[in-house]
From Swiss-Prot:
Organism: Penicillium patulum
Domain Ketosynthase family 3 (KS3): start-end pairs: 32-457
Stretch list, region Disordered: 1-21
Keyword Transferase applies: yes
Protein name as annotated: 6-methylsalicylic acid synthase
Keyword annotations: Antibiotic biosynthesis, Multifunctional enzyme, NADP, Phosphopantetheine, Phosphoprotein, Transferase
Compositionally skewed regions (Polar residues) per UniProt: 1-14
């Protein structure tokens, strides 16, 4: 066994010490500027995946040139048919990695979904940088948080172009995923490095410049370690074609440096990495110094005869500068690694420069050798410099100059005879005449960057190991690990293969040291106890083959949220066995620990413990007691010498003595005196007593024993067992009696009744013999007592303590429980055989623990030293910290294999197609006509396109049952334009063309028929079925020409029949009522007449465009007017219903001119069995331009809540009675916290006497007294905010109330307290008083708290100051409860109440009048400007826009910055439409805002303000537990102070309307919106307050506006909305909602839609229950799977855990786009690659799968699959 000690063993052997022990200072290097290369890695063409393989390739003069892998250019062949011709003429040969796409994303915790959005250069650089660190022997985790620098050469953006040009599929992660900076930044991010992290683009000089930057960072003290390198990946043909055009590329795809046939370079790919340190630091750290960088330099070649032309003078300058920095004579440099790109101009120029610097004046027989790596591996461009550098380092290390590849004849344009340089043409030993090996490295960029470095060997060599090959001092530990379990076998195989081949000459001790001290220890670990080299090979083979081995441990560390600290448990009597110490007394550490005790004990009783251990003669109880202590002291020393230390200690019986010593409470000598003198006393009672282990809890056993004192429970072992002690015969009788009852008992090997009254007679003698011998102190390690009633008691271990320890019960259960409560989960039983491990296991399981370990130190009759290592191995594999350097202080082996990657191909599948406009349809033409493809040999042709939300061929919104569909007008326009026909017959609209998912669409024209077909585009192209998935949507027959229409409409005659003049918006309102909330096109009716069977409507297809201004779409499109025709045509029927066109007998177009902007629709109801109409499109001159004949409609069954109706969009908040729970909440104690003493007293007086209560005047007073309160299950903290007398006090009071509640929540969550927190408010819902206004933000805050921390508590809005105990107990799971009329109620969204509908005579309330002024706060914000636009559209002519920012003077508007241009443009547009726009710079939240606003209104002299819109707001999302007071107030102020300022300036009834912009986020509990939700809840209550005073005040509780404002749709917001069960709205839908609410006498309107839920999917927030709809069926009342189904859910136990684990892993896998097998149940989801957007998606997936509502913070509080499984199991149990 390894040992840190160097003292002599009893056998006389000594342990080896490494050369360069910690005492060595290396003072001669302390002030050196030298930088050491301590690690190196590479991956280049030819399978050269490490420097050693590369070296062999160099010696063999191999060239890795080959054809480019076909997949690289495949997308370009598909993109455009023309590309094939050009690609055939593009150089396709070069030096390529075999599988560039391979990446081990799981190792780095990156999901496949994110990985495919990462440039392969980032991926390969991550792996190669990791390999370099392993080669350096630097555990990556040891650099976490350090100033380590990363500099990386990179200048290829092929992958970026490939993925970013696929515009429809661009995703958020592609930005950093394809950026140059992403390469070094990704390395820094993964390793958590805080030093410089920079991408270097200096073209082909990039990576040598990166090395230079790394050297400088170390020399300047910026970083202690630098990871430097370069990478190149060739993913596309573009740059290769450029270089072909420039003549830079070799036509045969190979590099021929220095050869006469050199005619261009060949591109190569790969990566190289170096790890750098200062030489002094490297030596202190005992690093393997591969080479020393003496000097480096970078310069630019200035203005040459072309930016890409090489410059010999600049190359000489760089070399001379590097030599100068190194202070080295160029003649001492034996080898120069040249850039040598194989170009006709470049090679001679470079040789000239090298010759001038290194070859000048050299003797012919002493040349400077030169070479270049490029013919071997190609020109890696940005990675070229580092690869040349690596070659130079290898040559220095090996002492051999490798021969040049691809060299047939030296370049005749170079005068080699006088150059003083010589190309290495065969492997050449480094000349022994050189006192030190030195080399130069050149690298140049085609933009003019020139770089050079000078390196040399490091001469001190480590001495050979005195133990010789394969020897090891006793057994040792071989450690392996990986982020996933499956890696362990692979790592074992890799190491075993290496040990039997190239590693066979390495010392096993060095290998073990390397794996323990120079490698990371990941979460999955294997630890193998091995005897020698051969044994190590065999055990590794067993692990690789999945075969168990006695001394092999394999497990995962405890969960990330579980403490890895270790509790040492020293057990008592019963662990002894004869040979337990025979081996150990020969261990120097063990021997040194017990030898002083041996002398003391011999002096006390005349016996030598060491001799007893040698002979095994210690059967008597007195000797067992002494030797138990001695062994535990020796084992403790041995464990500590092997790097294990206790973080807490428990002693059991006699084990309490050693426990006290190890904890520092006693000295070893004091412990020896206690155990020895007590053992002498025990001789008086030996043979008289007995003990049995009873398989019953101690309480039950005591009941059986009764009150007798001669037979007692001596040890409370666990919740299910105890030990009984007493007279020997009585114990035997009791055992028999218990067996008769069916109770199992086991005899304890003891003849003394320890811890029983039979020892009472020994107490005083023990006091006497220990008197004045002990000087106990407080322990320095946490020490739990098993002798005291309180296991955490801090009593000194004095004489009285040991008197009690001898006779009192051993309370092991309580001690272990206390340790568990304090967070400990790892227990090490320090004994010679496990005595209490089983009991500890039982206690842990009884406490509900699942992830824990109880580990024995030794086992009876097992090799002791091996088993001690085995116990350390088990601790290590469960995550305990081990100081491996203490156990393995020797040298380390530099050749041990690095990580074996588990690669999977990851490559973004690009949806490529021709780039010309024919690929996809032109949305502005309102058709689905994409690329036209004729079918050869037929008269059939097909238009093919892709349809999704971004390519919908209409400008508006056209939802049906919550799903966007293409309007019928768009399909008809498609047929007309696609056929060129003027007539369609028998148009059958079969299935709507939905846009809810991407689909391929084809318009097929065949003879006289035309149809639209489509199929969904699957996420994986392999899932595409060529035929089966096509759906036919619409069909028709067509004719190219139609006879011109002679029909004309006599408007006067028609109007004379149409006696009823309708409101202009009749059809819009009709459609709105039946569920059509939005139009696909922006037409409007400006005149409308009807009778029973006819209609005449004047239609403007775009009223926003005035005069002759061009339309915003293709002017030839008939779709807008046809959409008006189909829509108005459906409103002629007397009974409103949701209808859509199903069949049209004939569609005719009678003109070849563009359709007019304004036309008339003449509609006639037809006589038919189904609703049918004829519609003519008529010019203003009365000419019939187009006609629908017999347009038949089918009635669509409306689905409440998901159709496009206003009823599904605008809701009220209703308060139906709450449903009580069956099981009430237990409330035993109520803690009242309120700043208002009177209110607090009133509430307290309402409590029944059976409930304990405590009162505090502030949260701080409560916190100060918390330690003395029963903060346990059954306790509720009730926060009661105070009263407020005036509106002036409201802002400050609101801030105080919300922060007090936040403090209470943080205190509860941070303390993991099982209490509930209730908030009681005073009639907020009525909104009548300043108190209600001040407390109202708590409404919003409470809902967000309930969302982030479910089941923590509830806000109850009460009518009277009475604690609503019944409500608190029985109304569970609600976020807000309102008590009205004594009834507890919870909130639900419901349709607007009909009794609130205003009489038609009153007209809408919330619309402007031309004569008034309309004020908008946040007026220059996106939403503020949209409101301004809407108000102008509805007639407003004077706007006052209030904003914190001012606009520049109008004269400078044409020169404003880009960010202001949209604002200026919008204001100019408003003014062009006749509005007068005034901008007032004013912070409405400031104390003087009222005065400033009033003064400004007087100054401006505008007509009186008739309407106010408060749209100002600030959003700063933070989780409840992370929010700060300042950040919270920053969001609250614009909402509260701003609204109150407006309230004061414009009191109730002084304006026509007072509109406030709130959010639905506080109603559904948007995660992170505690502050925003609080502010909006205030606005909601202020609206109620004003409305009760007779004001037209409304709070709009908006969902997200699509693409606009603070809630603008993003991937995260969309996912959050989806998870809450709601959708966003368009701008038009929002203002349609405004107009709809204007018809009602309401003080609020919730504007959102419920999405359609899957069958059985839980409703995520209960407030949606009444408006939520399902696609199929209704909510299932069963648990996640129907009873009796094949997927029935197990009810409990391991089966349920396995079921949930499988289901949850499946959900995670679906989100991450990986297999379920690759999801580690115990890995943090963040480590698997789950980001913030994916977290929301995962919640939805879990809800769909397990049919249980998931709170937003679940994955934060339960960060692994295992944690989630526990949570779901608890929910299922309920």
């Amino acid at each position: 066994m390894h040992s840190a000690a160097t003292s002599t063993y009893p056998s006389g052997k000594t342990s080896p010490a490494p050369v360069g022990t910690p005492g060595t200072e290396y003072s001669e290097y302390e002030f050196s500027n030298d930088v050491a290369v301590v690690g190196m890695a590479c991956r280049v063409a030819g399978g050269n995946h490490n420097p050693e393989l590369l070296w062999q390739s160099l010696l063999s003069q191999k060239s890795a040139m080959g054809e480019i892998p076909p997949m690289r250019w495949e997308p370009y062949y598909r993109r455009d048919a023309r590309n094939e011709k050009f690609l055939k003429n593009t150089t396709s040969r070069g030096y390529f990695l075999d599988r560039l796409e391979d990446f081990d994303c799981q190792f780095f915790g990156i999901s496949p979904k994110e990985a495919e959005q990462m440039d392969p250069q980032q991926r390969v650089s991550l792996e190669v940088a990791s390999e370099a660190l392993e080669d350096a022997g630097i555990p990556a985790k040891s650099l976490s948080g350090s100033d380590t620098a990363v500099f990386w050469g990179v200048n290829s953006d092929d992958y970026s172009k490939l993925v970013l040009e696929d515009l429809p599929n661009v995703e958020a992660w592609m930005g950093i995923g394809t950026a140059y900076c992403g390469v070094p930044n990704r390395i820094s991010y993964h390793l958590n490095l805080m030093g410089p992290s920079t991408a270097v683009d200096a073209a082909c000089a990039s990576s040598l410049v990166a090395i230079h930057h790394g050297v400088q960072a170390i020399r300047l003290g910026e970083s202690k370690v630098a990871i430097v390198g370069g990478v190149n990946a060739l993913c596309g043909p573009g740059l290769t074609r450029v270089l072909d055009k420039a003549g830079a590329i070799s036509s045969d795809g190979s590099c021929k440096s220095f050869d006469d046939d050199a005619h261009g370079y060949a591109r190569g790919e790969g990566a190289g990495a170096l790890v750098l340190k200062s030489l002094h630091r490297a030596l202190l750290d005992h690093d393997n110094v591969l080479a020393v960088i003496k000097g480096s330099a970078v310069c630019q070649d200035g203005k040459t005869n072309g930016i890409m032309a090489p410059n010999s003078v600049a190359q000489q300058l760089a070399a001379n500068n590097a030599l100068s920095a190194a202070n080295i004579d160029p003649h001492t440099v034996r080898y120069v690694e040249a850039h040598a790109t194989s170009t006709p101009l470049g090679d001679p120029t470079e040789i000239s420069a090298i010759a001038s610097v290194y070859g000048a004046d050299r003797p012919a027989d002493d040349p400077c050798y030169i070479g270049s790596i490029k013919p071997n591996i190609g020109h890696l461009e940005a990675g070229a410099g580092v690869m040349g550098f690596i070659k130079a380092v290898l040559a220095i290390q090996k002492g051999v100059l490798p021969p040049q590849a691809n060299l047939t004849k030296l370049n005749s344009r170079i005068d080699w005879k006088t150059a003083g340089v010589k190309v290495v043409q065969e492997a050449t030993p480094w000349p022994e005449s050189d006192p030190i090996r030195r080399a130069g490295v050149c690298s140049y960029g085609y933009g003019g960057t020139v770089s050079h470095a000078v390196i040399e060997e490091f001469s001190p060599i480590l001495q050979p190991d005195p133990l010789g090959n394969g020897a090891v001092s006793g057994p040792g530990l071989l450690l392996l690990s990986g982020p996933q379990e499956k890696r362990l076998a692979l790592q074992a195989k890799t190491l075993r293969d290496w040990m039997t081949a190239e590693g066979k000459d390495h010392n096993l001790s060095d290998i073990l040291t390397t794996l323990a001290t120079r490698r990371d220890h990941h979460d999955y670990r294997a630890a193998l106890v091995v005897d020698d080299y051969r044994d190590a090979e065999q055990v590794l083979q067993s692990l690789a083959n999945g075969v168990d081995h006695t001394f092999t441990t394999q497990s995962r560390v405890l969960g990330s949220d579980i403490s890895k600290d270790v509790v040492w448990v020293f057990s008592g009597h019963g662990a002894q066995w004869p040979d337990m110490g025979k081996q150990l007394i020969h261990n120097p550490v063990f021997f040194a620990a017990i030898q002083p005790l041996d002398e003391l004990i011999q002096a006390e009783i005349g016996l030598s413990p060491i001799e007893l251990l040698r002979t095994g003669d210690f059967e008597s109880s007195d000797r067992v007691q002494i030797l138990t202590y001695v062994m535990q002291i020796g084992l403790s020393a041995l464990l500590q010498s092997n790097g294990i230390t206790p973080q807490a200690v428990i002693g059991h019986s006699v084990g309490e003595i050693a426990a006290s010593v190890v904890a520092g409470a006693l000295s070893p000598a004091e412990g020896a005196l206690i155990v020895t003198r007590r053992a002498l006393l025990y001789r008086q009672v030996m043979g008289k007593g007995g003990m049995i282990l009873v398989n019953l809890p101690s309480a039950e056993t005591e009941e059986i024993l009764g009150s007798r004192s001669d037979l007692v429970v001596a040890i409370d072992s666990s919740p299910s067992s105890c030990v009984v002690a007493g007279d020997k015969e009585l114990v035997a009788e009791t055992a028999e009696a218990l067996k008769a009852r069916g109770v199992k008992t086991f005899t304890v090997k003891s003849d003394i009744a320890f811890h029983s009254p039979t020892l009472n007679g020994l107490v005083d003698p023990l006091r006497d013999v220990l008197a004045e011998t002990l000087s106990p102190v407080s322990p320095n390690v946490k020490l739990y007592s098993t002798a005291l009633a309180d296991p955490r008691g801090q009593d000194l271990r004095d004489v009285e303590y040991w008197a009690g320890n001898m006779v009192n019960r051993v309370r092991l259960t309580s001690a272990v429980k206390a340790a568990v409560e304090d967070g400990y989960r790892l227990f090490l039983e320090v004994s010679t055989h496990p005595v209490v491990s089983h009991s500890i296991n039982e206690t842990l399981m009884d406490a509900g623990m699942e992830d824990f370990a109880v580990i024995p130190t030794l086992l009876r009759k097992k090799p002791t030293e091996k088993h001690i290592l085995h116990s350390i191995a088990q601790l290590h594999c469960r995550g305990a910290e081990v100081n491996w350097a203490a156990q393995m202080p020797g040298r380390w082996a530099t050749g041990v294999p690095t990580t074996t990657w588990m690669h999977k191909p990851i490559w973004r599948k690009i949806e490529t197609a021709p780039l010309h406009t024919g690929l996809t349809h032109d949305v502005e033409k309102h058709t689905l006509l994409g690329q036209r493809i004729p079918v050869p040999g037929t008269d059939t042709y097909v238009y093919t396109t892709r349809l999704d939300n971004d390519t919908k061929p209409f400008p508006g919104s056209h939802p049906l049952h919550g799903t966007e569909i293409v309007p019928a007008a768009g399909l008809i326009n498609t047929f007309l334009k696609g056929t060129g026909g003027q007539m369609l017959q028998n148009v059958v609209l079969r299935v709507p063309v939905a846009i809810n998912a991407p689909r391929s669409v084809q318009v097929v024209v065949q003879q006289d028929q035309v149809k639209v077909v489509s199929r969904l585009i699957p996420s994986e192209p392999s899932q595409l079925d060529d035929d089966a998935s096509w759906v036919t949507h619409t069909t028709a027959y067509w004719d190219r020409k139609v006879a011109g229409s002679e029909d004309r409409i006599d408007f006067a005659a028609v109007k004379s029949r149409l006696v009823t003049k309708l409101a202009d918006n009749f059809s819009i309102d009709y459609l709105d009522k039946v569920g059509v909330s939005a139009m696909g096109f922006p037409w409007a009716v400006t005149e409308h007449y009807r009778n029973d069977k006819e209609m005449l409507a004047r239609v403007d297809v775009n009223p926003a465009i005035s005069g002759d201004a061009p339309l915003p779409w293709d002017s030839s499109s008939w779709a807008p007017v046809l959409d008006a025709a189909t829509s108005v045509g459906s409103t002629i029927f007397p009974t409103p219903a949701l209808r859509m066109p199903a069949q049209i007998e004939r569609v005719e177009v009678f003109t070849s001119q563009d359709p007019p902007k304004i036309s008339w629709l003449y509609v006639q109801e037809a006589s038919d069995s189904v609703p049918t109409s004829h519609v003519s499109v008529v010019s203003e001159a009365g000419e019939v331009l187009a006609k629908f004949t017999a347009m038949r409609f089918s009635e669509i069954e409306g689905t409440p809540g998901v159709s496009g109706s206003m009823e599904s969009l605008v809701h009220q908040i209703a308060w139906p009675p709450a449903t009580p729970a069956e099981e009430p909440l237990s409330i035993e104690t109520v803690i009242l916290v309120s700043p208002d003493a009177t209110t607090r007293a009133l509430y307290a007086a309402s409590l029944p006497t059976r409930v304990n209560s405590f009162q505090f005047s502030s949260t701080q007073e409560f916190f100060s007294n918390a330690s003395s309160l029963p903060l346990e299950k059954g306790t509720v903290v009730t926060y009661i905010p105070g009263e407020v007398a005036s509106l002036a006090e409201v802002p400050a009071a609101s801030e105080s109330f919300t922060w007090n509640l936040l403090e209470l929540i943080k205190f509860t969550v941070n303390g993991s307290l099982p209490i509930k927190v209730f908030t009681l408010t005073a009639n907020i819902g009525e909104g009548q008083t300043p108190t209600a206004l001040a407390q109202s933000p708590l409404y919003g805050l409470a809902r967000v708290i309930a969302s982030e921390h479910p089941d923590l508590g509830t806000l109850i809005d009460v009518e009277e100051p009475v604690i609503p105990l019944s409500t608190m107990r029985y109304i569970q799971g609600a976020d807000i409860i309102r008590i009205n009329d004594g009834i507890a109620r919870t909130s639900r969204f419901r349709s607007l109440p009909r009794n609130k509908l205003l009489p038609a005579s009153e007209g809408p309330r919330l619309l402007p009048r031309p004569e008034g002024t309309y004020l908008i706060t946040g007026g220059l914000g996106v939403l503020g400007l949209e409101v301004a636009d809407f108000l102008v559209e509805k007639g407003a002519r004077r706007l006052l826009l209030i904003s914190r920012r001012a606009l520049p003077p109008r004269r400078t508007w044409d020169q404003v910055s880009e960010d202001l241009q949209p604002t200026i443009a919008k204001i100019r547009l408003l003014e062009s439409r006749g509005a007068s726009v005034h901008v007032l710079p004013l912070d409405i939240t400031k104390p003087d805002a009222v005065e400033q606003l009033t003064t400004a209104l007087d100054r401006l002299s505008l007509p009186s303000v008739q309407g106010v819109v408060h749209a100002a707001g600030v959003l700063d999302n933070e989780l409840v537990m992370q929010t700060t007071r300042d950040a919270f107030n920053r969001v609250l102020a614009p909402k509260i102070a701003g609204a109150l300022a407006l309230h004061e300036v414009f009191p109730p009834k002084s304006v026509d309307f007072f509109v406030m912009f709130s959010s639905c986020g506080n109603l559904v509990g948007f995660t992170g919106q505690a502050s925003y939700g609080s502010g909006n809840a205030f606005l909601d209550t202020l609206a109620t307050h004003r409305a009760r005073l007779g004001d037209a005040a409304v709070s709009f509780q908006w969902t997200s506006w699509r693409g606009l404002g603070m809630g603008a749709s993003t991937d995260f917001i969309n996912a959050e909305l989806e998870s809450k069960g709601i959708t966003d709205v368009t701008r038009d839908e929002a203002f349609a909602a405004w107009q709809h609410l204007a018809k009602y006498d309401m003080d609020h309107g919730v504007v959102l839609r419920s999405r359609a839920f899957e069958d059985g999917e839980p409703i995520p927030v209960s407030i949606l229950n009444d408006i939520a709809v399902r696609r199929v069926g209704t909510v299932s009342n069963t648990s996640p799977a129907a009873a009796g189904s094949s997927d029935a859910v197990p009810t409990s136990g391991p089966e349920l855990k396995a079921y949930l684990d499988e289901k949850i892993r499946g959900c995670v896998a679906k989100v991450l786009q990986m297999t379920a097998e690759d999801v580690d149940s115990k890995a943090a989801l963040a480590d698997l690659g789950v980001d913030s957007v994916m977290t929301v998606t995962l919640r939805r997936q879990l809800q769909l799968t397990l049919k249980i509502a998931v709170p937003p913070t679940l994955t934060w509080s339960h960060p692994t699959v295992s944690h989630l499984a526990v949570w779901f199991a608890e929910k299922l149990a309920k």
